[in-house]
Every structure is written in structure tokens, then in C-alpha cells.
């Protein structure tokens, strides 16, 4: 197994772990809603993100908590299995950025998380970009199996062009 497969599985395990923790905590939606409604860390988020948080997320906090559970589980499973890896990698980047912004962005320290929180989420985002751009990350994946069955899917799933075959 190549190193990029391990990177893909590791990033998937980070998301899966977060999703399982949220799933096993029956109080998570209420805790998430309470922390959002307290609003202390929203004020340290970038201004454009504060508007989004106050206008969309806070009024629907329990729904967003459920979406986080499902999203983290889905990203973890997809990356570990290598199923729709490119889409999962994009989702991983987006969710990592949203999490960092919701905690105060690069001015982290006054929000809910420790500096390690910022480091982990930025690292997950960067590794997800590498997964997205690297064909080697799709080895030993369900995407590779699907691409073998349909050559037309290979560029989409594996970031590889179809070989030009000349007819004799």
C-alpha cells in the first residue's frame, strides 16, 4: 500500500472518529445549540461568517448538529473506502474551513478551541487537497474498482486520463 493511501485513510479516520463521537453523544445537538446560542465565539469569527452563523446556523443549530454528525461520518467512510474520493476530499476541505472559521479563523485562541484545534483542521484541509490532486491516493479504493469496470469514469474518479488506443 502506498503512502498516499495511508494519508487518505488517516484523514478518513479523523472524520469518522469525530462523527462517531457526535453520534454516541445523545446530548450533542443540544450542546451544540447551547454553545452557538451563547455566541461568544461567533464574535471572533470573520464578519462575513458571523452573518452566516447568526442568520442561518444559530436559528437551526440542532439541524446543523445533525448535519455535522452525518457529514463527518459520510466523509470518514468515503475516504476510508475510497468511494467518490474526489468529492469527499472537496467536502473535507470545505468542512475543515467552516470549522476553522466558526472557531475564529486564524485569530483562534479566543474561541472554543485550543491552538491544536486550528492545526489539526488546517492539516486535514491541506491533506485533503493533496488527496484530491494525487492519483496515488485513489489506489486500493472502490473508485479504482469502479474505474476498471468503466474506463469513462477513470478521469473523474482517479484523476487519470484514458489511454489513447490506436486502432490497427
Predicted segments — roles?
Residues 1-74, 81-168:
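Extended, low-polarity transmembrane helix blocks
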Amino acid at each position: 500500500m502506498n503512502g498516499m493511501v495511508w494519508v487518505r485513510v488517516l484523514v478518513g479516520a479523523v472524520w469518522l472518529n469525530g462523527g462517531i463521537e457526535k453520534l454516541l453523544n445523545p446530548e450533542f445537538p443540544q450542546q451544540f445549540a447551547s454553545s452557538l446560542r451563547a455566541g461568544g465565539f461567533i464574535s471572533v469569527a470573520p464578519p462575513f461568517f458571523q452573518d452566516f452563523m447568526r442568520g442561518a446556523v444559530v436559528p437551526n443549530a440542532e439541524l446543523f448538529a445533525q448535519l455535522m454528525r452525518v457529514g463527518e461520518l459520510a466523509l470518514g467512510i468515503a475516504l476510508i473506502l475510497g468511494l467518490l474520493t474526489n468529492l469527499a476530499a472537496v467536502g473535507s476541505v470545505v468542512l475543515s474551513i467552516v470549522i476553522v472559521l466558526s472557531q475564529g479563523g486564524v485569530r483562534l485562541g479566543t474561541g472554543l478551541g485550543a491552538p491544536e484545534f486550528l492545526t489539526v483542521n488546517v492539516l486535514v484541509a491541506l491533506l485533503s487537497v493533496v488527496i484530491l490532486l494525487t492519483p496515488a491516493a485513489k489506489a486500493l479504493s472502490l473508485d479504482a474498482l469502479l474505474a476498471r469496470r468503466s474506463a469513462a469514469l477513470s478521469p473523474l474518479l482517479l484523476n487519470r486520463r484514458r489511454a489513447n488506443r490506436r486502432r490497427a
